[in-house]
Amino acid sequence: MSAFRVAIITASDKGYAGQREDLSGPAIREIVEANGYEVTHTVILPDDREMLAAEIARICDEDVADLLLTTGGTGFSPRDCMPEATLSVVERAVPGIPEAMRLFSLKYSQRSMLSRAAAGIRRRTLVVNLPGSPKAVRENLEYAIPTLAHGLEMLRGEGSADCAR
């Protein structure tokens, strides 16, 4: 089995404008590479629903990655739109992933219940929204990545077809 390919989208108006350094995207890269995944694409985009949706769709449709991880845009700010962009282009929602991450994160911060993160599948790519803070990215991704690997194997037609075990 070859390494899973990962694309990373950071949603940040200030990051896109060069006014803030992206720390969450590199945190994602560090974690996935430490787990044997290959990062094939990274991009910083503004909090613009249409731009984000178009990039998510392009990555999935052009088979750029097996796993697309996004960071940022999942909160209550008026410009936060990553879940809406994600859900507008995925073909199948996977609500259990963000539900589990929110539940896990409650032990670190009650504010995690304010996350609007979403997840879904388009073609053969799993799309997962992560929080915008590097600390929350690490907590969520380190928790979820072992289970995500099983889902990715299933999308590839490898491994057990049993989600329940």
Locations of regions flagged by a protein language model:
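Non-catalytic beta/alpha edge segments that cap or flank active sites
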Residues: 1-165
